Amino acid sequence: MAYSAAMKAAIGEMRDVLKAHGLGQQSKEFSAHGEHKPHDDAPFVFVACSGGRDSLALAACAQVVCAAWGIRCGAIIVDHHLQDASHKVAQQTAQTCRDLGLEPVLIVDVQVKERGQGIEAAAREARYAALVGTARRWHATAVLLAHTKDDQAESILIDLIRAAGTDAFAGMPQTQLFDDVLVLRPLLGITRAQTTRICEDEGLEYWDDPTNGDAVPLETALPASYPLRSRVRHDLMPYLSAFAGCDMVDRLARTARIARRDVEALNQEAERALAQTVEFEGNMRDLQADRLADDKLGANIDARALERWPEAIRYRVIARTLAACGLAYASRHVAAVDKLVSQWHGQGKVALPSKYSAKRKAHVIRICEDITHANRRCAKRN
């Protein structure tokens, strides 16, 4: 079958990413022409599909590659129930995925609970939980997400707007582990224009989320009520490209690839330093593990040992420690704890979120729930 240039590019990206994770051709029999059915024990991947142009292009591309390589490929459609048409969109998307040949195709209903982080973040949290939970139940090898080069560039700008730091320039990683489930982003080298072309060439009818602002003319700025990502896409990115006289999507995506290498090297060093300088107390499984609300975690930092590491590594170790304790920390909290490490002169404790504190005694910095608050909580429970 002859594929368009956009589809060929996406297939190439998909092959590279799958092969890099041991998901290459499963048997020589799949090199021969003709239709072949994956073996029952073949690796199994899920495509996360919303019905939008990016995820339908991903589904079509994944099915082509997986069918050719003997890999089982299914789809997960998450219905957030945030819009009136969500049920209809989910059903139509499921049928499109079945028509493409994906099996099984699952619709997963979720309840989005907004707890102060914003509805967009709450929906993302619910979606990832549903994808990871479903993948675990089906023993899937990986979940494929449809983030594109455009999404990568937009993510960098969003992270820079919301926070500062090296990690903001690294964007989204191509590979992530969520609760031991492998999550892959095979289309980070593919543009939204290419996914649109794939859908058009393959005759795939996609759905545009109205909150994306696609129906609003480019010369009209989106109101502040639209999600930040939509406003960055619709307003900021075109302005930056016009101002710079170049394709800022491509420029930012290339920046992300370079910065990602640096960030991963820093993270590896930080993990080594963490293992050597921090001891956790409580039910600690790993830094991404979910804990019960009353399952409080504390940590002891060997300040003398940590002081020997460069500042960039110290900050990452402290940030990981605070995150592992379940604290919604800010950069000022990390800096304040680092002063207990590198500028120690007998100062008092550092107040942290969630009624936690960091206090140094001799060479040990103890991070734990403030004793007064802990006593009150225990009294209420009893």
From Swiss-Prot:
Ligates lysine onto the cytidine present at position 34 of the AUA codon-specific tRNA(Ile) that contains the anticodon CAU, in an ATP-dependent manner. Cytidine is converted to lysidine, thus changing the amino acid specificity of the tRNA from methionine to isoleucine. The gene is tilS. Disulfide bonds: none annotated. This is tRNA(Ile)-lysidine synthase. HAMAP family: tRNA_Ile_lys_synt. ATP binds at S50, G51, G52, R53, D54, S55. Pfam families: ATP_bind_3 (PF01171), TilS (PF09179). GO terms for biological process: tRNA modification. It catalyses: cytidine(34) in tRNA(Ile2) + L-lysine + ATP = lysidine(34) in tRNA(Ile2) + AMP + diphosphate + H(+). The N-terminal region contains the highly conserved SGGXDS motif, predicted to be a P-loop motif involved in ATP binding. Belongs to the tRNA(Ile)-lysidine synthase family. One of its GO terms (molecular function) is tRNA(Ile)-lysidine synthase activity. It is found in: Cytoplasm. Its EC number is 6.3.4.19. It comes from Bifidobacterium animalis subsp. lactis (strain AD011). InterPro entries: Rossmann-like_a/b/a_fold (IPR014729), TilS/TtcA_N (IPR011063), tRNA_Ile_lys_synt (IPR012094), tRNA_Ile_lys_synt_N (IPR012795), tRNA_Ile_lys_synt_subst-bd (IPR015262). Keywords: ATP-binding, Cytoplasm, Ligase, Nucleotide-binding, tRNA processing. GO terms for cellular component: cytoplasm.
